[in-house]
Amino acid sequence: CILVDASGLERDVDDIKTEMWEKYDIDSLETGRDFEEPLKWSYAVGLLIDRLEDEKLEGETVVHLHEWLSGPAMFNFDSPAVFTTHATVLGRALSNSDFDLRNAVEHGNVDGSLAEDYGVKAKHQMEQTAAEISDAFTTVSKNTGKEAEAVLNVKPDKILPNGFNVDEYPSLE
C-alpha cells in the first residue's frame, strides 16, 4: 500500500491547470477545492506511477483509473491506461434536476454545454478528456455505456460489469 501526500503540489495547481488548458482545453480557471484537491492527488499519483515505471515496473504496467478524479494521473505516465466511469459527472448533475436524462440518452443528445449551467464544466471536460486519451475506455453497464456515449461523445471500448446477476447463481440459503 502506498499513501500519496499531494500537499506539496499546492503551489503548482495553477501550473497544472495551465497545462490542462494548453494540452486538452480543460477550462478549470474558476474551480474550487472540490476540483483542485482531486487534481493535485491524481497528478501526484501519475508522477508516482511514472517514477515506478522507471525504477521498478519495466513495462509491465497497465493503469486502471476510475472516474474523473483520476484523470490527471494520465498526464504523467507512459503505461497503457484503462479509464472507467460508473456514471458521468454531467449525467449525475442532470439526474438531480428535472432534466429527463433517460430520454436524452435514448435519443443520444445530451448537450455537453449544460455542464457549465450545472457547475460541473471542468469535471465534465476532465472526464471527457480521460475517456478520449485512455488506451481503453470502459463503463460498468450497458446503460452507463449509452450515457457515456451521449454525454461524453465517446463510445466505451468495453463494458466491465461491476456486479453480477444474482438470478444466475443458486441461493446459498
Predicted feature locations:
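Catalytic cores of nucleotide-sugar-dependent glycosyltransferases that transfer UDP/GDP/TDP-activated
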Residues: 1-173
